[in-house]
Structures are given as structure tokens and as C-alpha cells.
Amino acid sequence: MRAARARELVAEGDQPTAVARVAQISRQAIYKPPRRRPPAAGPGVPGAADAAIVEIAKANPTDGTRMIAAIAGRELDEAINRKRVQRIMRTHRLLQPIRGLDRRRRPGFFRVTRPNELWHMDMTKVWTAQHGWVYLHAIVDCCTREIPAWTLDLRGRTDEAIACVESGVLGHRVSAGTLTLGTDNGTQFTSRGFRRHLSGRGITHRRGGYRDPESQAFIESWFGQFKKRVAWRAEWETINEARRDIAEYIDTYHHRPHSGLRYRTPTEVAQTWRTLNNSAT
């Protein structure tokens, strides 16, 4: 406002130097023509990218703005700013409350240098109408975040846990003496048969502390996301229906960005390691 009034005084014949001194502005502000801001776009009609971001956010209601931006960037093949995603999601009321940030934080426990060096394994249960509770064993590779093996059975005994380990070892051709398997202190994992099987396979068994889920952070996190995205929203009639949906979810999981991998996918990270190994041999 002072610059505009100063220009009016100069136009009426006053000296620019004196006007600038009294108005406490620079002479450049008097001589420089005012720059008009373009009119605000207003709500208007959203572009194709904005509409795509909305659809992605609706399809992934448990994900935050960073993950939605990463997924949208891949699908649209362009860089998507997180703040843009946040603005769009806020406009469409798609933002979720941020969970408490005062939860206990610890320095990283795990230092892995290659795939098949450290696996985390655990068991959870899901509900089916016909069979009641059924038991899901799953293993996550702490390097690539892939799921090397999983099983869904009517029981959660030692035999089912061993079968899951065998599936992962055979499927990934794990050599003896190269793998450490981390579990909690569940009865099937502390059983004599399970420990004997790991010893026979040359697998080092590392058990976490009691009431310490952070010692199994990767598999606990994976189960948490699986339950939010699939298990709590599903109504399975039979165990076969559950197996079908879990298999589909794991395939999708392998090809979606992972925040722990700097928003690369587990499949991409695993392929990078395979390429490095092939070039080294």
C-alpha cells in the first residue's frame, strides 16, 4: 500500500527521493511496476492426475500420504509431491488420524547385508465361517521384505511351522549355515521337534525376549498391515477362500512400494540382488 501511494505522489510531481524517505521504502519499489498475481484457480475441475490420486487413496484407505504419493507416481509415471497428495486427500476427507508418535522407539536391531541372511517368522490366526479360527504362518526376509513362504492350516502346531520353513528353504535354495531364523517364544517355535529340524537344516535359531514384539519387528509389522488391509475386512466362508485372498494379497504386496525400502518394491530389491550376484560370479 505504501508503494502504491508513493507512486501516486511521484506522479503528482513530488521528488522520488523524498517520497521514498518519508514512506520508508526503496526508490526501486517506486520505479518497479506492480506485478499482478494471476487469479486463483479455485476448486474448478480436477485434472486427470488429481482424480487418479483420489481413486488410489480410496483403494488404499490404510495408507498415508507418502505411500499414496509413491503409488501414484508409479501408476502415473510422473513425480507426485506428497503435499499435493495431502491437499487432495484433505479436500476429499480421505486423511486418517495419525497414530500416536509417543510409542517406544529403539535403535535398529537388525543389520542385514544380503537376502536369506535373516528371516523373521511368526503365526497369527484368521476367522473363517466354516472352519472357525485357522492359523497363518508367514516368513519375511529382513533384507528384501519378500515373503519367502507362508502356510494357512487348520492347526498351528510344530508340524505346520516346520512345513512353512521347509517351503521357504526349498523355494529359495537356502544353503546350510547361511540363514538365521528369528521367532518369538511360541510353543511351536520352542518345541524340541522344531529346534531339531532347524539344527538339521543348518539354520541358526534366534528367539526374541518375552513380551518384546520389537525383536520380531518385520513380521509383526507385516501381520499388522495384512490384518488392516485384508483380514479385518474379509468375510471368508472356507479356508480355501482365505488362501486365495492371502495369495493375491502377497502377490500385490511384492509389487507395491515399501517405505522400508525407500519406496521400492520387494520384487525390485530382490531382482537387484540377483543381478549383483550374477555379475559377481
Segments the model singles out, each with a brief description of its role:
Residues S199-I203, G224-T281:
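C-terminal domain-tail junction helix/linker
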Residues D141-C142, L152-R157:
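A short acidic/small-residue loop/turn micro-motif
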Residues R27-L118, D212-P213, T265-N277:
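Basic, flexible linker segments flanking DNA-binding modules
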